[in-house]
């Protein structure tokens, strides 16, 4: 069971709501994934009514909403978006995203740390999207973040665990859950992240842009479960030299 800020999750697959062709397909895919934590971009919500066609079906599905600050270019904008989410959605949870460069969507480490500190002081449950930087993740943990979300590769690229060496370091040292976010493009990527010891993964593009999002959601669900079970079972040690599985000469001596 995964626990974040005192809340237990049976599923270690978190999902997003963007890029689906319809709200109905989004909802059916989320149900198929069995995800219990779903991200929602504040920039997609009608600021006048506090709702859109996303929120009602998601609430009916019983998932926990994780509003994100995607689109924020600095700490000030991210803090504003988080406060807006708390007021409109009634949640302290926030996925902190600050990426001023619209081309590569790389997270701004300096602004993210500053915003995280302020939001934690204001009582938010902060889950920051960041580079796979072990030092930065330690700093975010120290200011009170409930989890850290290092990227596997750039958002939406489906490149997989490009940052694997650094993710391993983060997992090794972290005292809060590590959720691998961004760039996970195949169920095998998700399984591998879980085999490394990640606490969860967040997947959006790979499911939403699939020819069959519902089927792909099922695949990711199974992959995450298998990867976690493999980690808990204990994977064999990787070696450079061959190791025989049975005696090579015993039968010759008989």
UniProtKB/Swiss-Prot annotation:
GO cellular component, one term: cytoplasm
Name of the featured protein: Thiazole synthase
This protein's record includes keyword Transport: no
Gene name of the encoded protein: thiG
Keyword line: Cytoplasm, Schiff base, Thiamine biosynthesis, Transferase
GO MF entries: thiazole synthase activity
UniProt-listed SUPFAM superfamilies: ThiG-like
PANTHER family on file: THIAZOLE SYNTHASE
